[in-house]
Amino acid sequence: MSDGSLLDELGWRGLIQLSSEGLEERLAAGPISGYIGFDASATSLHVGHLLQVFLLTHLQRAGGRPVIVIGGATGMIGDPSGKSSERNLLDETAISANSASLRAQLERFLDFSDGPTQPRMLDNRDWLGPMSVLDFLRDIGKHFTVPYMLAKDSVQARLAAGMSFTEFSYQTLQAADFLHLHRHEGVDLQMGGADQWGNITAGLELIRRVEGRAEGAEAERAEAEG
C-alpha cells in the first residue's frame, strides 16, 4: 500500500468522517509522518484506543511514519472532550507509571525495525514541561482568540456545567504539540477520534499562524466507530 491509497483504504473501512482541505494532495506528494496522542491519564489502553492504533498500523503499512505522543504533560490536565465533568488531576508519580505502561503496550502493535517507517515514540513533557507560563502565553496563547476557543464543541458542551481554565486551555496544549512535531519531526498529519476534531483544527490553525502558511493535514476516524 502507498500513502496515496491510504485514504481509499481507510475510507473503504468507514474510518474517515472528517478531513482537512489539502489532505489528499499532501498524501499524493509522498511519504508522510502522522501522529496520534495518548494521554497518560490511565494505567492501560482501553477499547476506545483500538481504532487509533489501527490507524497507526495502516499508516505504517502505507509507507508513512507513525509518531506516538504519550501525553505525560497533557495527561496531568485531562482532555475535556467528550467528558461531562472535570477529571481528577494525577500527580507526577502516577503519570510516570502510566506513561511507562502505555509505552510497553503500544510497542506491541507497530514494527520498530530500522527504516523510513520506523515509529517514533515521544513524551510531550519533554517540550511542554520546560516551557514557562510566560513563554507559553507569548508564543502559543497569543495566536488564539477567546471566541475561537469558545466555539469548540468540547467547550460548548461544558459551559453550562462549568469548566476550569485548566481544561479550557487543553486545546492550546494539544495545538502546541502539533506545532512542535511539525517543526521538529516533520509531522503533517494528526489523526484522532471525532471528539478530537476541535483540538486537531486548533493545531492546524496554530501552524498556519506561526509558520505563515496553511500547512499540515489531518484525518479523523468516524465517531460511530469509536
Segments predicted by a language model, with ranges:
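NTP-dependent nucleotidyl-transfer catalytic core
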Residues: 1-225
